[in-house]
Every structure is written in C-alpha cells, then in structure tokens.
Design a protein with these regions (language model features):
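A helicase ATPase "motif cassette" and its flanking acidic/Ser/Thr-rich regulatory loops
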Residues: 158
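Short, electropositive alpha-helical surface patch
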Residues: 212-218
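Amphipathic alpha-helical segments that form well-ordered structural scaffolds
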Residues: 82, 184-192
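Surface loops and adjacent helix of pleckstrin homology
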Residues: 161
C-alpha cells in the first residue's frame, strides 16, 4: 500500500499542466508516485524511503543547475531529474530509464489532457490547434519558441526552434530523457481524435533532441 503522506514526492518530468486547468484539490503527482513505488518494489526493499530521501536532498541538484534557466522550470523539473539520477546510481541506466519512462508517459498523458482541456471542450481540430497555441503562451511549454508554419481547416504545422527542457537535460548530462517527453506528445495528439486527426513530425529524427535545429509538429485531418 502506498503511504498517502508521501504521494506528493514525485511528479512526472516535465509537468505540462496549467494550474487553472486542474480541478481544485487534484494532485496529479498522486498518479506517478504509486507507479514508481510499484515498479521499484522488486528493485529495493523500501522504495518509499528512497523517494523521501530524494525529496529531502533535491536541493543538491538545484544548486548545480545553471541559473539562466527559469526558476519555475527548475522547480518543476528538479525532483524528477534527481529521482532519475539516483535510480541510475542504484539500478543502472537501463533499468532507471525504463522505470522513469513508464512514470513519465503515464503521468504526462494525464497531465496533457488537463492542460488542453480535453474534458471541458468539444474535441475538434480547431480546438486542438487553438489549445496548442494557447499552451505555448501560458502553459508549461511557454519557455519554448514556437512558429506557426501553416494552418488551414485540414492541416496545422508548427516548428519549435528552441526547447529549454532539452537544454536543461543536456546541461545535466541527461539528454536521453527529452525523447520520452516527445513520446507524450505522440501519444496525446494521436489519441485526441483517433482516426480523424493524425500527428507526425514529417519523418524520423526531426527533433532538436535528434540534433536538428528545430522540432517539427504536423497535424492532418484524415477522416
């Protein structure tokens, strides 16, 4: 059983939830903490204590982060990154990555739906495009630089020319985590209006995380 007193310890990285989208009293970290504890139950005797220790020592990582990064971004990202770093030291990179990938994808998809108001607004192509632009202005992707390339009734394309999430992970020697965040986008966008709107990036390796200068985001109405 998960101790409810520690359910606030771990959140997915990076969190993409606008606070005004989240229901009062809803702590989305309650999604990822039980997942981590469950996944780690055979890797260590006391996974709950491991997470508490990470919570109490996360200041060590925060002091290492370049102050050029926004304080809000640091506050959001530091603990999940610190959990991952400690898992790598304890379990090795491969196991740590797979554990964090499940937590990030599960929590991230739930958070995406809150951020984009999926339960509050009708699911239409127009609303999806509007939400993407709005999230980039006021949501937790507001630190990225977005340019609209094309928008019509059947196609929407943007490019991200700067991703601070990737810059942060690279600065800490953890670039492998950025593609996991991209996987949240893949799952979320393609499940918003399945079989009606398809999301792609114009082909493989079209991301800043792949060494490109920009990330391509393309939505097309197909049904």
């Amino acid at each position: 059983m998960v101790n409810p007193n520690i359910s606030h310890l771990v959140d997915s990285f990076p969190s993409k939830v606008a606070s005004d989208r989240v229901s009062p009293g809803m702590d989305l970290r309650k999604i990822t903490t039980p997942i981590l504890i469950h996944l780690l139950r055979h890797d260590m005797r006391f996974p709950t204590l491991f997470l508490i220790r990470c919570k109490l020592t996360v200041g060590r990582l925060k002091r290492r982060i370049d102050p050029r990064f926004p304080r809000e971004l640091i506050d959001i990202a530091a603990l999940p990154l610190w959990v991952y770093i400690n898992l790598k030291n304890k379990l090795g990179q491969r196991r740590a990555f797979e554990v964090m990938r499940i937590a990030i994808l599960t929590g991230g998809l739930a958070q995406w739906n809150f951020q984009y108001g999926a339960a509050e607004k009708e699911r239409t192509f127009k609303n999806l495009c509007d939400a993407e632009i709005a999230v980039n202005k006021t949501g937790f992707t507001k630190w990225n630089t977005l340019e609209v390339v094309d928008r019509s009734e059947h196609r929407f394309e943007i490019r991200i020319t700067r991703c601070l999430y990737h810059e942060l992970t690279v600065s800490l020697g953890l670039p492998e985590l950025t593609p996991v965040i991209c996987q949240v986008d893949n799952a979320a966008f393609n499940s918003y209006l399945p079989d009606k709107v398809v999301f792609n990036r114009g082909g493989p390796n079209h991301r800043i995380a792949d060494g490109k200068k920009e990330c391509n985001f393309i939505w097309e109405v197909v049904g």
